[in-house]
């Protein structure tokens, strides 16, 4: 009896899998244009917002710290350069002398500032000149964009050789010139080849050859 349990026997053959067909470009295009479900991000929206807020807070703290450091450096520089004035117990003449000294210091600082500004302006001008020279050198060695231009052989030779182009292009100058009269004379001499053969045939023709 045959086994009815659904199992395959020794004589049964397993069907071969269908051949894999390559998708056409149209199918690929259709697949690409079809809307697909977007992959879910591993980070939720609330978590992203929290991280952005934290980054902004850290950046704000860094900016505040840098501003505080600049203010501290400015205060230290002013304390070393501008010492506090001691005005207690000074008379009118002493105050005038102190004012004159302060004015002299201000004038000296202005002169130094003017000298520094002149040096900075000179350096900026020199840098601009050097940059201009660099651009000029780049422009000299820059390869221009070439365009296709239709030009005849005569025009090309004229551009390359100049006045000598006419001599080189005159190809007929070295050829042998044959006059029209010479060709007509040769044609008359040839004439009808049958008559020449008849004239030279027979005894008379042989006689003419010996006589000639």
From Swiss-Prot:
Residues found modified as N-acetylalanine: 2
GO BP field: cardiac muscle contraction; skeletal muscle contraction
UniProt PTM: Phosphorylated at Ser-24 and Ser-25 by PRKD1; phosphorylation reduces myofilament calcium sensitivity. Phosphorylated preferentially at Thr-33. Phosphorylation by STK4/MST1 alters its binding affinity to TNNC1 (cardiac Tn-C) and TNNT2 (cardiac Tn-T). Phosphorylated at Ser-44 and Ser-46 by PRKCE; phosphorylation increases myocardium contractile dysfunction.
Cited InterPro entries: Troponin, Troponin-I_N, Troponin_I, Troponin_sf
Positions of region (Involved in binding TNC): 34-81
Function noted in UniProt: Troponin I is the inhibitory subunit of troponin, the thin filament regulatory complex which confers calcium-sensitivity to striated muscle actomyosin ATPase activity.
Subunit structure, as described in the record: Interacts with TRIM63. Binds to actin and tropomyosin. Interacts with STK4/MST1.
This protein's name: Troponin I, cardiac muscle
Protein species of origin: Bos taurus
Gene: TNNI3
